[in-house]
């Protein structure tokens, strides 16, 4: 399962970071927008890694949003 951490920045934007995929993070005007963008980016990164024969994190599910 990929874990997402979500925080509100000082400027009001939201950032969602995928803990299990270092460097994968996305901003949004709302919390939900940041989460959806991070999920979409994560799926692209995982597909790219699989396509190139790279390892991906072991997952029992897909996403868990952490408080």
What would you call each of these model-derived segments?
Residues 2, 20-23:
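Short amphipathic alpha-helical segments
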Residues 22-33:
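A short, exposed loop/beta-hairpin motif centered on an aromatic-Gly-Thr core
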């Amino acid at each position: 399962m990929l874990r997402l951490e979500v925080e509100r920045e000082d400027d009001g934007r939201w950032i969602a970071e995928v803990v299990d995929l270092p460097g994968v993070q996305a901003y949004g005007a709302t919390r939900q927008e940041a989460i959806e963008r991070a999920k979409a980016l994560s799926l692209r990164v995982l597909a790219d890694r699989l396509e190139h024969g790279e390892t991906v994190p072991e997952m029992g599910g897909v996403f868990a949003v952490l408080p």
